[in-house]
Amino acid sequence: PDAILLSWQGGQEGGNSVVDILSGRINPSGKFPMTFTVKLSDHKSHKNFPKNPKMITIEGLVKNLIFPPSETPKAHKVKDEDYTFYHEDVFVGYRHFDSKNLSVSFPFGFGLSYTDFKYSPMKLEIENDTINISLNIKNIGAFPGKEVVQFYTEKLNSIIKRPSQELKSFAKTKRLENNESINVSVKIPIIELSYWNETVNDWSLEKGEYNIKVGGSSRNISQILKISL
């Protein structure tokens, strides 16, 4: 198909909304809050998915009837049935797919529109332990629409294991007419660039260089600026 309309939980007006979008009365502007993979096994957590059919036994079913999951004695708990280890660590969702540069069906933050948007060069300043970012978004297509502008950060030459990029902020424009522009600005507290340091049991900020990225999805970055902290 040329496109797929994903109309989750539209409520009683969901049908009317779908018709409005398909007929061109309204321009879709939603973005995915997850990554759609090519294969289920591409998920880093795939090996730890619970309720593997091969693990279901008569003994296990009887145990679940006798002991609710919260009351199962520790000696009888079964891995990936009564409990699961999150071996993916901080590489959850798009953080894993983007860090490994895996091919995906639809990336995190992706969404189609009947129009196109142009991003002006970012303006960036650091003040009061906050990264202030602003840029203009222009509707350069023939159809009115809204854009969800996404801001990601990347630590260069990190001394710890961390994702290649992480979403730190986003902003949605108002409905823009053809050739209409609007200024979008966000504030990212520098503390948001910290990582959880298990050695000191607290948040720590890595000194050094960071990339500030902006784009329409995690795989559609329009520009990058480098800062030093």
Segments the model singles out, each with a brief description of its role:
Residues 124-126, 174-178, 205:
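Hydrophobic beta-strand core residues of beta-sandwich domains
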Residues 159-198:
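Intrinsically disordered, low-complexity Pro/Gly/Ser/Thr-rich segments with frequent PxxP/GP/PP motifs
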Residues 104, 145-147, 159-161, 194-196, ...:
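Short acidic, gly/pro-rich beta-turn/loop elements at beta-sheet edges
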Residues 131, 147-152, 163-168, 198-203, ...:
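Composition- and surface-driven signal marking solvent-exposed, interaction-prone regions
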Residues 130-132, 181-185, 222-224:
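Intrinsic-disorder/low-complexity, polar/charged segments enriched in Ser/Thr/Lys/Arg/Asp/Glu/Gln
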Residues 189-229:
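Terminal connector regions
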Residues 1-146, 154, 207, 211-215, ...:
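Secreted, periplasmic, or luminal enzymes acting at the cell surface/secretory milieu
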